[in-house]
From Swiss-Prot:
[4Fe-4S] cluster binds at residues 30, 55, 116. It is an enzyme of class 1 (oxidoreductase). This is Light-independent protochlorophyllide reductase subunit N. Its EC number is 1.3.7.7. The gene is bchN.
Amino acid sequence: MNARAEGCTAAPDPSSRVVRHERGQHEVFCGLTGIVWLHRKIQDAFFLVVGSRTCAHLIQSAAGVMIFAEPRFGTAIMEEKDLAGLTDANDELDRIVTQLIARRPDIKLLFLVGSCPSEVIKLDLSRAALRLSQRFSPAVRVLSYSGSGLETTFTQGEDACLASLVPVLPASTGTEASLLVVGSLADVVEDQFIRLFDGLGIGSVQFFPPRNSGSMPSVGPNTKFLLAQPFLPDTARELEHRGAKRLAAPFPLGVEGTTGWLRAAANAFGVDEALFDKVTQPARVRAERALDKFRKELSGRRLFFFPDSQLEIPLARFLSRELSMELVEVGTPYLHREHLAEELKLLPADAAITEGQDVDLQLDRCREARPDIVVCGLGLANPLEAEGMTTKWAIELVFTPIQGYDQASDLAELFARPLVRRAKLVA
C-alpha cells in the first residue's frame, strides 16, 4: 500500500458489507456489444449475430466500422416471416453460414450469437452450431452463445463467449503448474504482463481468449488462473469444472491493484519476495510518478457510479485509494462477492454500494448529491450533461486499455479529462 492510501478505512470483512439491492427499470447495452472488442482480439474468428436490424445497427454503430471495411462480424437479419414461423429459420441460417465461409476462407472459428429476437422464437443455436461444426470441421469450428439483452448487461457478452469456449479447450497433459490469464486484454497490455511474468520466472503463462483460435490454452487440474476482468463468473465456473483453480486477487487497475494481482500469481508459484520487488519496482515507481500529475485535479472530487460495466468496484477502489476521490455511490449491475472479495476489502468501509438498478431512484439520488463526475451509460450521459453535470461514458472504460502499471495514468486521465473540459467551458 502506498502512503496516499493510508488514510482510507477499509472494510475488514467483505461479507459483512451492507449493499443496497435495487430491482427496477435499468439502462444498459446488451451483450452483443462485447463483439466490438472480441472480434479484434480473436483475429481469425467471426461473430454472426442472429437477430434484427436493430441488432445490426447497434453493432455497426458501436464498432464505428467504415462502409468499405470488411469486419469479422455480421448479422443474419430475422425478418417478420421468420418471427411468425412462416419459414424454417435453420435452413436460412445454414444457407447464410455456407455463403459466409465460402466467401471468407480466413475464418477458423465461427460464433453464432443469439439475440432477443432469436430467443423469443426459441431458435436453438446450440444445435445449429453442432450441426454446422460437424459439416465444416476441421476447417471451421462453430460455437454459439447468447448476447441477448434480456436482464443482462453488456459485459456479460464476453463472459458468455468465453464460457462457450471452455468445454472445447484442450486438456493439459503435463504435471507442471501453469498460469492462465482470463479476460480480454489489449495486445499491448498482454505483452507488458508477459514481460513481468517472465521476469518473475513464471514462464508457463497463457492468455484466454488468445489472439487466434489456433492458440487456445490447455486446461486441467494443474492450471491456476487469474481473472483480468471482474465480469466473468460463468467462465470461471466452467474453468473450475475443468479442474482449474482461481487465484484470489484484486484486479489489475492502478498501481495497487496491479501489484496485488501480480503478487497473487507470484505467491502461487513460489516467487521470492525480493525478486518480486526487483521485477515490479521500476514499473511501480514509473506509474506512481505518472499518477502524480492527476492527483491535484482528482483529489477530493466526488464520484457517482451508475451500474453499467461491472468494472465499478475495482475502479472505485483505484480512484478512492490512489487518487483520493470521494465515493458518493458505487452502483454495479451484479456483485460477485467471491470474485470481488479482495476489492471489497480495500474499499472505504462507508462506501455506499448498490447492486442492480432502479434508474429513476438512482437519478434522484444523483441529482440530490450533485457529484463532481458521474460514470454512466451513453443513454444517461447527455441528459445529465444538459443538467450541468460532468459525465464519463462507462463503455469507454471497457474499450480503452486500462490494465497494468503503464496504463494507470491513462486510466486516471480518463476521469481528469471531463473535469478539465468542464472547467474550460465554464471559464
